């Protein structure tokens, strides 16, 4: 077993290929044990703080269920549940929580904040999402791909379609470079990833055999893909001008059945971190329809609900992979 005890999980850039593969294998083992009813608790007596500056369904539920399964207690601090960033600095909050808790999860805006929590709390800190990165999501995405495709990670051709600067796109590119995947990013030139991050990933890829390719050409980019992946085009709270600009750029990149056919792979799977705007059955979805006339955004309802979609298996795997991170870094 790899010794990751007391390590924080802030970005996959902090981990080696062997360490990432260990976490993925541990996720498989823990999932199998839960299904078989033979799970052994490694977090008994541990207290975990969950800091959420941004609301969440999957991340919160995954951390709470994983902690409960493993015997830990959690305290949820929602967007209005603490003074961090308002009356108290993140450095001070880190030192307060570090004296009471054995581990801290943070989901919010700034990568700098999660790094500050890790530096000053003295306990493992786990990144549940920042504007720059989403490392726990990637573990679930990769585990799901392996389960569905029955291929080792290095043989998977993983394609992200959409906004190449998105935090999930960033995290996937990092993860793919570490485990040796072929990673295609299909996006408009205006939405290509940060050059510094791309350079880091390309350097890692030289040592792992990974391949990173970026193109605006949809047909070229998706051909032979094993996985097509997308995420929302715009985050809530961004102004109307941004929505209009982003929709104009990304509407050709909506994942449709036609795009799945372009892969020329009958076994291609569709992944999405969720939530997804694939119909108008939500308030946000209906508002988008009213403002922009779109009944679906980043993915068609046909693909989302179709046989290639594995998004709910992927969502469940958030819990198993998050459990692996907590057990590996905090478990007895």
UniProtKB/Swiss-Prot annotation:
> Which InterPro entries does the entry link to?
Asp/Orn_carbamoyltranf_P-bd (IPR006132), Asp/Orn_carbamoylTrfase (IPR006130), Asp/Orn_carbamoylTrfase_sf (IPR036901), Asp_carbamoyltransf_Asp/Orn-bd (IPR006131), Orn/put_carbamltrans (IPR002292), OTCase_ArgI (IPR024904)
Transport among keywords: no
Query: Which reaction equations make up its catalytic activity?
Result: carbamoyl phosphate + L-ornithine = L-citrulline + phosphate + H(+)
Q: Where does carbamoyl phosphate bind?
A: 56-59, 83, 107, 134-137, 273-274, 318
Instruction: Return the EC number.
Output: 2.1.3.3
Pathway connected to this protein: Amino-acid degradation; L-arginine degradation via ADI pathway; carbamoyl phosphate from L-arginine: step 2/2
Q: Which residues make up the binding site for L-ornithine? A: 167, 231, 235-236
The alphabetical list of record keywords is: Arginine metabolism, Cytoplasm, Transferase
UniProt main location, coarse: cytoplasm
Query: What would be an example GO MF term here?
Result: ornithine carbamoyltransferase activity
Describe the function of this protein: Reversibly catalyzes the transfer of the carbamoyl group from carbamoyl phosphate (CP) to the N(epsilon) atom of ornithine (ORN) to produce L-citrulline.
Q: Which family does it belong to?
A: Belongs to the aspartate/ornithine carbamoyltransferase superfamily. OTCase family.
Q: Which NCBIfam families match?
A: orni_carb_tr, PRK00779.1, PRK04284.1
The molecule here is called Ornithine carbamoyltransferase 1, catabolic
Q: Which organism is it from?
A: Streptococcus agalactiae serotype V (strain ATCC BAA-611 / 2603 V/R)
